[in-house]
Structure formats: C-alpha cells, structure tokens
Amino acid sequence: MKCLFLLCLCLFPIVVFSSTFTSQNPINLPSDATPVLDVTGKELDPRLSYHIISTFWGALGGDVYLGKSPNSDAPCANGIFRYNSDVGPSGTPVRFIGSSSHFGQGIFENELLNIQFAISTSKLCVSYTIWKVGDYDASLGTMLLETGGTIGQADSSWFKIVQSSQFGYNLLYCPVTSTMSCPFSSDDQFCLKVGVVHQNGKRRLALVKDNPLDVSFKQVQ
C-alpha cells in the first residue's frame, strides 16, 4: 500500500515556477470551474469557517471534529473524527485554502486545497490544525487522517472536494508533489476517497476504497 503511494507521487511532474510569479500573475481559473456550495446554496468563501456535516441524519449523521488520537504521543490533539450521531455537539470549524484562495477567489470542485481547523490554539499546537494523511495503520488496514500537515507544500496535505454520486460532496486525498503542476483537474486517477473506519469506538476519517463519506458544509455563525 505504501509503495503504491510512493509510485503515485513519482508519477506527478514537478513543475518549477519562476520567482517572478506573484499576485500580479494569478492562477487563471478554467472557464468551467464549478464553485463548491454550502447548505444554503452560497459559494464557499476561503475567508470564512465551516462545519463539515454529514448529508444524513441520526445515527448516520455526525459532524467532523478534532480529537485526541488513541496511543498518540503528539503533544496536541491530532485525530480527525466524525461524531457518532448528528444529535450532540457541533464539529470543529474548518477553513479551506485552495490553489486560488491566495488571490481572493473562491473554493472550486476538483481544486487542490488544504484543510485547516479554524480554532484558537497555543503556539505549540499551531501545526496540529492542518489536515494530512498519516502513515499506514496495519491494525486498520488503511491510512488515517490526522493533523500536522503544511499549507502549500509538496507533502501529504492535498485534498479535493468533488460531487458525490449520492448527496452533497466527497473529499479526496491527492498525493501531488506540486499544486502548481495542475491546480485544477477532474482526473482523479491518483486520488483516494476519504471515508470512515471504527477506531476504539469512534469514527475516524481514513482512506477507503468504497463508501466515501458524503458531506455538506455549513457556515459557522
């Protein structure tokens, strides 16, 4: 499994941009770029925070939240979970940092982006707010989502939002070496689905082959 990820990483070209690339030379959005919408039909705004909520209710529902990973020696909470029901607390707010967000534009489907928990935290825990995919967990047979990623870097922190085949949206993990090589692409050949596995009685976000998590986005008031 790990070898597959390394192979995927090697298949993406590394593009080196000129140092003259600045805000005066912004990314040109494709003409067919489709903005991601929240539950009210408004376009996602990279300046705002959102709850990632399930498109289902009751026991099938539950918001995404930041929590302590079992058996983790990290100094801060670094696990990404989903509540076991939509009855209870709201999830941890997130913000989306897309390839175009630095230029005041929105968040779009199939756009490579970073996800960051939008919470106040200590200086020690600042780096434990950015989503990434962790190492392979042999006991669960997959790779778990956690925090500790980096924004805008060629590592394990790149995701996409795509239309679900059922309701709402799906999250994809895309192991890309450079976001600038292809910031917008509908070719998800090398992306993997984000779903849920059960870990110590909790629903943990992880990479899955089937049954991806269907989500919607609700603006934090």
Swiss-Prot record:
Disulphides: 76-125, 174-191
Positions of short motif Vacuolar targeting signal: 25-30
Location within or outside the cell: Vacuole
Chain ranges passing through the membrane: none
Entry keyword annotation includes Transferase: no
InterPro entries reported for this sequence: Kunitz_inhibitor_STI-like_sf (IPR011065), Prot_inh_Kunz-lg (IPR002160)
Conditions for induction: By sucrose.
CDD domains found in the cross-reference section: beta-trefoil_STI_CPI-like (cd23372)
UniProt signal peptide: 1-22
Keyword annotations: Disulfide bond, Protease inhibitor, Serine protease inhibitor, Signal, Vacuole
Site residues (Reactive bond for trypsin), renumbered to this chain: 95-96
Record PROSITE patterns: SOYBEAN_KUNITZ
GO cellular component: vacuole
Domain of life, per lineage: Eukaryota
Residues annotated as site: Reactive bond for chymotrypsin: 143-144
Signal in keyword set: yes
A Gene Ontology molecular function term of the record: serine-type endopeptidase inhibitor activity
One Pfam entry name: Kunitz_legume
Propeptide: 23-28
Role noted for this protein: Inhibitor of trypsin (serine protease). May protect the plant by inhibiting proteases of invading organisms.
Family statement drawn from the similarity comment of this UniProt entry: Belongs to the protease inhibitor I3 (leguminous Kunitz-type inhibitor) family.
Protein name: Probable serine protease inhibitor 6
Species annotation: Solanum tuberosum
